[in-house]
Each structure stands twice: as C-alpha cells, then as structure tokens.
Amino acid sequence: MEPMSEPFEHWESAWDSPGFVLWHATLRWGAAMRAALAPHDLTHVQFVLLASIGWLVEAGGAPTQRAVADHAGADIAMTSQVVRSLEAKGLVTRERAAGDARSWRLGLTPEGKARLVEALEAVEAADRAFFGAAPDPGSLPSVLRALARRDRSGRIVEG
C-alpha cells in the first residue's frame, strides 16, 4: 500500500497540527481535573455547573437553569440531569421561577458553597501546575478566549 502523502503534506508531523496538539493537551488537562475533583466527589461537568451557579449568583441573584447552561456552554438537557444530581447530593437548590412553570431558579446550599470553595482551590492549583508548564502561561487565557468566543462559522458570539 502506498503512503497517503497528499492529505498530510500540510504538517511535517502530527504534532505540528494545532488541532492534534490541542486534543492531546485537552486529554491531559481533563485527567488533571478528574484527579483534582475526585476527593471532592465531583465530576468535571458537575464542578463546571456548580461553579457557573456560583458565578451567576455572585453576579446578582438566582440564575435560571438555562442561564447556567448558557454560561457553562452546556446542553440544556444535560444541564438539567446534572443539576438534579447536584440537588440529590445536597449541593444545589432548584425552585420554580415565578411566572414560568417550565423554568427553574438555581442556588447553592451551604454545603454546595463549601464544596465549591474547596473544589475551586483544588482546580486552581491543578490549573497552575498544568498551565504553568507552558512557555508563556500568562498569554494562554487571551488566546483561549479568542478561540472559545467563536461559533462554528468563525463569528464572535460572546463579548
């Protein structure tokens, strides 16, 4: 069988492809997050939604489940399932929104606040260790923000 040279001519090595490198970095970062969150009995998705609720509550009030999903960049159905699991763990409160029987307002229980603070410290320490290995870790947030704020067509979708 002859090698497929044409499709691979753009990069000298797979490790020169930004997508391939990002994939591997994401795998390693995900493993670091799982290790940091395991002692707190939280999955990464649970942590992200718990933290999003915390951020939005701090910004002013009880966010809707939709607002939390949007903030986290998560699917609304998946958010609903995960929020119910956080509620079952005693970390989150859910109350029907006034005037809309389909909408839920979310908050953190005292245990949820405490768990979030502990988990956030662990995640931030893991982030410092992981991203600190980069040549210029201070530039990473702006680079990642520029990429994360674009939709599939390349348009900027968030501030």
PLM feature segments, named:
Residues P18-L37, L116-D151:
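Hydrophobic alpha-helical core bundles mediating ligand binding, dimerization, or RNAP-core interactions
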Residues Q65, V83-R84:
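Short, hydrophobic-biased segments on the C-terminal half of alpha helices
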Residues L27-D75:
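N-terminal helix-turn-helix DNA-binding core of bacterial DNA-binding proteins
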Residues A51, G60-A74, G99-A101, L116-A119, ...:
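Short, structured secondary-structure boundary patches
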Residues R84-S142:
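Charged, amphipathic alpha-helical coiled-coil/dimerization segments
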Residues G60, R149-G159:
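Short, charged, intrinsically disordered terminal tails
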Residues M1-H40, K89, G138, G159:
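N-terminal leader segment of winged-helix/HTH proteins
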